[in-house]
Amino acid sequence: MKYNTHTLDNGLRIIHLPSDSKVVYCGYQINAGTRNEEPGEEGLAHFCEHVTFKGTERRKAWHILNCLESVGGDLNAYTNKEGTVYYSAILKEHIARAVDLLSDIVFHSVYPQAEIDKEVEVICDEIESYNDSPAELIYDEFENILFKGSSLGHNILGTAEQVRSFTTEDALRFTRKLYRPDNAIFFAYGDIDFKKLVKLVGRALADDDSGKLAEEDCHADFSGGTGFAGDENSITTEKSVSSVKSVGPKNYPSVGEEIAGQTIVMQKNTHQAHVMIGTRAYDVNDDRRMPLYLLNNILGGPGMNAKLNLALREHNGLVYTVESTMVAYGDTGTWSIYFGCDEHDIKRCLRLVRKELDRMMEKPLSASQLKAAKKQIKGQIGVACDNRENFALDFGKSFLHYGWEKNVDCLYEQVEAITSQQIQDVARELFDKDRLITLIFK
C-alpha cells in the first residue's frame, strides 16, 4: 500500500491513501480523549465533540449542518479514551468544501453558550440511554475496576450532573490546549490528488508551507511489521515515526490483590444477568498482542464457530450473546469475556467458560486447528477492510497515536508467524483463575 504523507510547518501531519472510489473519507484525528481530562473534567472531551458543531467565527450551527448535507455528504464525530475524530464522507468533487468545513470547526469553534445550553440536554439524554443499556454499561464499569484511580477508569460520557456544569470557558480551555495542528493528523482515503489535498489543508489553516510539497513526500511505501491499533478489528503496519505523541500518562495502577481473582456483584435490577470476566492485558507495542489477537478470535470472535459461542449458545442454549474482546491502548490493555444469561444460569455459564479457558491453557492447538484459525481470521480481516469508512478511520487513528500505516499483506504475514506455543503461553498468563476478575450485574 502506497501512502502519501506530508507535515506542514505548524506540525500537522497529512496522510492519504489513494483509492478508485468516487467517495472520499477524510477528517481530523486529534490526540484529545478522555485520558487527557483532568480530575473534575470527566466527560469534557465528549462534551467538546458535541458542541464543536455549534458555531465558528465564520459559521452558525445551521450552516455547519447544511454545508455537506446539501451536496449529499456526511459529517460526523466520535470520542474515545485516546482521541477525538471529526470526519466526513463526500464525493471527491466536493473535497475542498469538506476540508474547509472540518478545519473551521476543529480549530475555530467558539462554543456559544446559548447553543451549549441546548446541546447539554441532548448529551444528558445520551447518558440516560446508555445507562439503560447494561450490556454496554458493564464494559465501562469493568474498566473502572481495572483502572480505578486513573483517567482510563471513568466512562467517556461522564455524568449528567458534570455535563450540565460545563460552559463555553471549559470547552475553550480544553480545545485550545489540545486541538492543535501538532497534536492532530488529517487523513484522507479516496481518489484525489495529494498535492491538491495538501494545498487545501494548508490554505484552510493559513499555513504558508502548503506550497512547498516536494516530490519525495508524495510516495511513501510503508512495509514494516504489522499489528492493529486499539481493538481487535484495527489493522496497521508498525512503523514508528519520531513525531508520534504520547497517548497519555502511565498512571494506571496494577490490579490489586484485593480484587484479582475476585467476583464482584452489583445489583442493577435487570431482567437478565450480565457477566464480564477478564483482566488487564497487553499494550499496542507488546509482542504478545498478536497471539492474543488470534486466541481471542478463536474463543469469542464474531464467528458462530467461536468456542464460547458453541459451548454456551449452540450446545446448551444458555445465552443469546457471548463474546470476548481485547483492547490495546498505548501503554496498557484489556481482555475480557461478556455474556448475558438468566440469573439462575450464571454458575453453569461460568463453569463452561472456565472449561474452555482451561483447555486453551492445557493443550496447544494442533497444526490443523491453528491453520483453520489463521484462515478464518485472515478472511475476517479482508472483509473488514472492504468497509472503506472504517478502514479510513482506523489508519488515521493508527498514524496519529502510533505512527503506523495499515498494510494488510504484512498483517497476514504476522498472523501466519503465530505459533501454537505462543497462543498457549498467552492463555496460561491471562487465563489464570487467580488473575481474572468477574463482574456480575443482576
Pin down the residues of each PLM region.
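His/Glu-based metal-binding/catalytic segments typifying zinc-dependent metallopeptidases
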Residues: 18-20, 27-29, 248-305
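Histidine-centered active-site/metal-ligand motif
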Residues: 46, 50, 274, 315
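Solvent-exposed coil/turn segments that connect beta secondary-structure elements
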Residues: 19, 33, 56, 91, ...
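Short, Gly/Pro- and small/polar-rich lid/capping loops
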Residues: 1-10
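Charge-rich, well-structured scaffold segments of protease-associated domains
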Residues: 7, 64-219, 225, 231, ...
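Residues located in well-ordered beta-strands
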Residues: 13-15, 414
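Active/ligand-binding-proximal structured segments within catalytic/core domains
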Residues: 11, 18-68, 179, 287-299, ...
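Short, conserved beta-strand segments within well-ordered enzyme catalytic domains
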Residues: 15, 25-29, 52, 76-78, ...
